[in-house]
Amino acid sequence: MINNRICILGTGAWATALGSRLSLNGNTVFLWGIDNNEVNDINSGYNKKYFGNTKFSSSLSATTDLKTAIGDSKYIIFAIPSTALDSVLDKVKEFLSDKKSQVILINVVKGIDAETSQILSNKIKSKLGSHYYSRLVTLCGPSFATEVFEEKPTVINGTGKNLKIVKQVCELFNSDVFKVIPINDIVGLQVFSSLKNLLAIAVGLSQAEYTSVNTMSAILTMGIEEIQKIACKMKAKKWTIMSFCGIGDIFLTCSSTQSRNYSFGQDLLKKGVEKTIKENKKTVEGFEVYKTAKNIITKYNINAPIFSSIIEVLEGKLDPKEFSKKCLELFWNQKINK
């Protein structure tokens, strides 16, 4: 097993879980963060903010100095909130000029750019150039960070422009409990990974009122159809919906209270929009992406009533208590499938 030097940008749950997996695979892992307390915690063998008093199974190092973190790393992983990607790309760019022939970039940030409605791999391309885009691999799939950290069996997908590099990254992560499977759909993987979070908010909201698997299944069915419409308009491949990054990730995010987006949706009914946003301390990707989803639906003139309704809730235009009632009306108006 080759010992690679790997830099992970981020010290959150996902960054730490992936760092632990890569370290267990025999690599030397450095995490970069801006929170001194988290950095010190990681250097002492813990990330108590996300994993309590569970000690790392292998050694991780962390620093607030970006130059030190990147060092002579062969791989650089972006594992930060999507809202921080712009500023972090600008910082990282300064340290990449002498690494054009070897460094491989890995993106695990989820989202679609709010201003341009472009997938994040294209944002990385616009910031760092075509050379690094050709050496970029994006990972996504059904994976709660806590379960990856606990070494529960997990399967996700990886995609990128260069299939050889994609396979290389897959092998970097693969173990007897963690598997990355290559997929040839850069757009689809990222669109599904983003929009499923907004659907999870819708499902969580409905479950707070009905606590019904029947209702959840109905909303999921219609919501998945809407995601597929949006993805195809953005040039995703139709079959990607049946992959781990498609239906697998949608099911995970829309069916468990471990999902921040699902829990956020439940809180919308219990506490209202304003209070839920104010009290929420963790990143909720679905809330971050709703404006982007609205722009895409409008741009392509897509009929997406479930998405349009949850967007109205998040904009304060529809009372959360009226959301499920509106969904019921949509169910009753469904026509026979041809």
UniProtKB/Swiss-Prot annotation:
Subcellular location: Cytoplasm
Pfam families: NAD_Gly3P_dh_C, NAD_Gly3P_dh_N
Residues annotated to bind sn-glycerol 3-phosphate: K110, G141, S143, K196, D249, S259, R260, N261
EC numbers for this chain: 1.1.1.94
InterPro entries per the UniProt record, alphabetical: 6-PGluconate_DH-like_C_sf, 6PGD_dom2, G3P_DH_NAD-dep, G3P_DH_NAD-dep_C, G3P_DH_NAD-dep_N, NAD(P)-bd_dom_sf
Signal peptide location: none
GO annotation (BP), single: phospholipid biosynthetic process
Source organism (scientific name): Malacoplasma penetrans (strain HF-2) (Mycoplasma penetrans)
NCBIfam families (UniProt xref): PRK00094.1-2 (NF000940), PRK00094.1-4 (NF000942)
GO molecular function (one): NAD binding
Reaction it catalyzes: sn-glycerol 3-phosphate + NAD(+) = dihydroxyacetone phosphate + NADH + H(+); sn-glycerol 3-phosphate + NADP(+) = dihydroxyacetone phosphate + NADPH + H(+)
Principal localisation: cytoplasm
GO cellular component: cytosol
Family label: Belongs to the NAD-dependent glycerol-3-phosphate dehydrogenase family.
Pathway(s) of this molecule: Membrane lipid metabolism; glycerophospholipid metabolism
Active site: K196 (proton acceptor)
Name under which the protein is recorded: Glycerol-3-phosphate dehydrogenase [NAD(P)+]
Keyword tags: Cytoplasm, Lipid biosynthesis, Lipid metabolism, NAD, NADP, Nucleotide-binding, Oxidoreductase, Phospholipid biosynthesis, Phospholipid metabolism
Chain positions recorded as NADPH binding sites: W14, Y50, K110, A145, R260, E285
The organism's place on the tree of life at top rank: Bacteria
Its job: Catalyzes the reduction of the glycolytic intermediate dihydroxyacetone phosphate (DHAP) to sn-glycerol 3-phosphate (G3P), the key precursor for phospholipid synthesis.
